[in-house]
Amino acid sequence: MRPVFYHRHAVRYLRRMPADRKAQVKAAVGGIAALEDPLSHANVKALGGEWSGCLRLRVGRYRAIFHLLMDEGDECLEVLQIGPRGDVY
């Protein structure tokens, strides 16, 4: 399983979310981190344009934008943004 890091923007939004939704998003991100290939998950899609190189995870009406990083030889998952569909892009 890859370690998961949250950018300060994602942490700020997580603090304001209802507790049940926060747990749902964190569980979904943890599930993606455990996968060998995140794109094999049905709710993950590669993004283009401004977010080129990033992936999107759909969790109900929320979206989490993340990318994979190499950290001292190990791959980790960094969550950049979390929010409702209309605001996160």
Question: For each of these PLM feature ranges, what is it?
Answer:
Residues H9-V11, E50:
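Short strand-loop junctions, especially beta-strand C-caps/beta-turns
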Residues M1, R8, R15-R16, A23, ...:
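Enriched for short, Lys/Arg-rich terminal
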Residues G31-R56:
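A short, surface-exposed loop/turn module that caps and links secondary-structure elements
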Residues A19-K22, D37:
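Alpha-helix boundary/capping and short turn/kink residues
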Residues Y6-H7, S40:
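N-terminal alpha-helical segment
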